A protein has these predicted regions:
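Alpha/beta-hydrolase superfamily serine-hydrolase fold, recognizing
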Residues: 1-153
Length: 153
């Protein structure tokens, strides 16, 4: 998400864009499934719920909570330090126990308030990373992605 919101921030660009000098890594659209939209809020949730499978990787990836806040797409929106708001589709299982659903709800509300276009599709009874398995929900997710691409490419 940070690469979408802050495509030219050197902290989130590892590889240079090849081609013409005036090319950028700005994205024309984003499709994301069960994203980490607020790393710090997710970490606090995981600590409160004692979910070690989320706590340990967060602490390994981020040096401290300040870095979690800095690396949070939600907080980037709140701070206003984003560069662009590409059209976005979020696929989210409503039984994802990695986050409370208030996190994507808040992100969508803020994204729209800032002028961005975002659609969120909830999948009843589906857990985190649900679309990695074949089934009706995955079929629905693929259909939504196709529709989104047809409208945005």
């Amino acid at each position: 998400m940070l690469s979408a919101l802050r495509y030219d921030d050197p902290r989130y660009t590892v590889n240079p864009v090849s081609g013409e000098e005036d090319q950028t890594a700005e994205l024309g659209y984003v499709i994301t499934g069960w994203p980490v939209l607020d790393a710090h809020a997710r970490y606090l949730y995981a600590r409160k719920a004692d979910i070690s499978r989320l706590i340990k990787p967060s602490e390994a990836y981020f040096p401290d909570e300040a870095a979690m806040q800095e690396g949070s797409p939600q907080q980037s929106l709140d701070r206003g330090d984003y560069r662009t708001l590409p059209p976005m589709l979020i696929l989210q299982g409503d039984s994802d126990d990695n986050i409370p659903l208030t996190i994507p709800e808040r992100f969508v509300e803020t994204y729209r308030d800032k002028g961005g276009s975002v659609d969120i599709a909830y999948f009843p009874g589906m857990p985190h990373a649900f679309a990695q398995q074949a089934g009706p929900s995955t079929d629905r997710a693929i259909g939504l992605m196709k529709e989104f691409l047809a409208q945005n490419v």
